[in-house]
């Protein structure tokens, strides 16, 4: 009886952990096509990429350009 209960608990533990560690798609970083001017604030770049270009997110990099993350 104890072996069945232990097996039952292990089964649900594995099932729970499998849900927590889902597979994520690959993300690519692309230069924004529509962002104008130097990228000085990541918040503005992120807003632009999400709301205007409908991508995942955006970030300013060392070259003062806005780079957007998208699914590959």
Swiss-Prot record:
A biological process term (GO) from this entry: defense response to fungus
PROSITE patterns, alphabetized: GAMMA_THIONIN
InterPro entries assigned to the protein according to its UniProt record, in alphabetical order: Defensin_plant, Scorpion_toxin-like, Scorpion_toxin-like_sf
Chain segments annotated as transmembrane: none
Gene3D superfamilies from the UniProt entry: Knottin, scorpion toxin-like
Disulfide bond keyword on record: yes
Function: Probably has antifungal activity.
Name the UniProt record assigns to this protein: Defensin 3
Organism: Arachis hypogaea
